[in-house]
Amino acid sequence: MAKNTRKKDDKKLPKVSYYCKPDNLTLKQWQIALRRQTAEKENFAIFEHNTKDSPGYYSVVNSVTKNEYRVVYRGEESVWNYCSCMDFKTSQLGSCKHLEAVKLWISRNHRKIYAGRPSYTSLYLSYKKKKKICLRIGTD
């Protein structure tokens, strides 16, 4: 079922400036905070895929543009997190507003984070720091 990322009773976090990096944040932390802030403002619909067959897989739909993005979230620092958007692929942060929206949705809905290794083996492109091809061995 679709869930929005915004709630009326949410407590507001301190606003992060788009123009000046706060002294208490690294450049990476600042950029991720900006994406989290954008995720809080935008009205995304989040669909969780079949948790038995595809644990950790989500679809994020922008309610204004109707663009849909595939997101895989396996935990805060997981190397297997992924989003199909260009920001995720080019920023080398390992995050984007869609991934941040999923994290907010999981937190607000008290959902379980699937941090386990998938059963299948795959060859994938890692977008963190620098692009590299990686092999993930599945559990089967």
Kindly give the residue locations of the regions a language model identified:
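Long, low-complexity, compositionally biased intrinsically disordered regions
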Residues: 1-140
